[in-house]
Amino acid sequence: MAAGMYLEHYLDSIENLPFELQRNFQLMRDLDQRTEDLKAEIDKLASEYMSSARSRSSEEKLALLRQIQEAYGKCKEFGDDKVQLAMQTYEMVDKHIRRLDTDLARFEADLKEKQIESSDYDSSSSKGKKSRTQKEKKAARARSKGKNSDEEAPKAAQKKLKLVRTSPEYGMPSVTFGSVHPSDVLDMPVDPNEPTYCLCHQVSYGEMIGCDNPDCSIERFHFACVGLTTKPRGKWFCPRCSQERKKK
């Protein structure tokens, strides 16, 4: 594939990337603003509770505490949604980077293959010209000697035959391109510095959920690895932390 085709295909693949990034960043800004609004509401409710705690009934104080708790719950949901958006944005960009690395590797492999073909053709062409020149000189000498002696003709013929048999035109080795197949470079290495998560000890990708146990050693899990298809409502604990909680 020509270099222009590689570039054209890659540019087509990233055509919508700026709009997708802009959308995700705008959603994250909206989540930040909603979180700040809720934090202001929590401060207001907390001040109201502290200033009038003695004069309020138990039911009124409990209602205020529930409002504060619900506001904190929504803040946590907004935070989780923002983390999911950030991970989705990272995966989106990383996918295009891997695509670019793969196309570059294929392009370099194509260049190597063409260089080998060109070198092989130039070598065969120069050696072929040299062989033809030698045969022409031998034939000329044979013709000049043939006028004076009939015995020179068979020798000249033998020399010409020998030249044809040993000519590089008929003895060039075949070139194998197996070492530069583009398919050998499709699997790109994973960044060794990228952190791993989940029970599978893999890098972050797709939809993930965080364990609500602050002491969880793993912290985040892939939906598929913990049997989830949608984000559960309320608190969620990973399988390990759930077992520990049951023991207590």
From Swiss-Prot:
It comes from the Eukaryota. Citrullination by PADI4 within the nuclear localization signal disrupts the interaction with p53 and increases susceptibility to degradation. GO terms for biological process: apoptotic process; chromatin remodeling; positive regulation of apoptotic process; regulation of DNA-templated transcription. A motif (Bipartite nuclear localization signal) lies at residues 127-147. Zn(2+) 1 binds at C198, C200, H222, C225. The modification N6-acetyllysine is found at K112, K127, K129, K145, K147, K155. Residues 25-118 form a coiled coil. The keyword Coiled coil applies. Gene3D superfamilies: 6.10.140.1740, Zinc/RING finger domain, C3HC4 (zinc finger) (3.30.40.10). Residues 115-160 are annotated as: Disordered. GO terms for molecular function: methylated histone binding; transcription coactivator activity; zinc ion binding. InterPro entries: ING_fam, ING_N_histone-binding, Zinc_finger_PHD-type_CS, Znf_FYVE_PHD, Znf_PHD, Znf_PHD-finger, Znf_RING/FYVE/PHD. The modification Citrulline is found at R132, R165. A zinc finger (PHD-type) spans 195-244. It is found in: Nucleus. One of its GO terms (cellular component) is histone acetyltransferase complex. Belongs to the ING family. This is Inhibitor of growth protein 4. The gene is ING4.
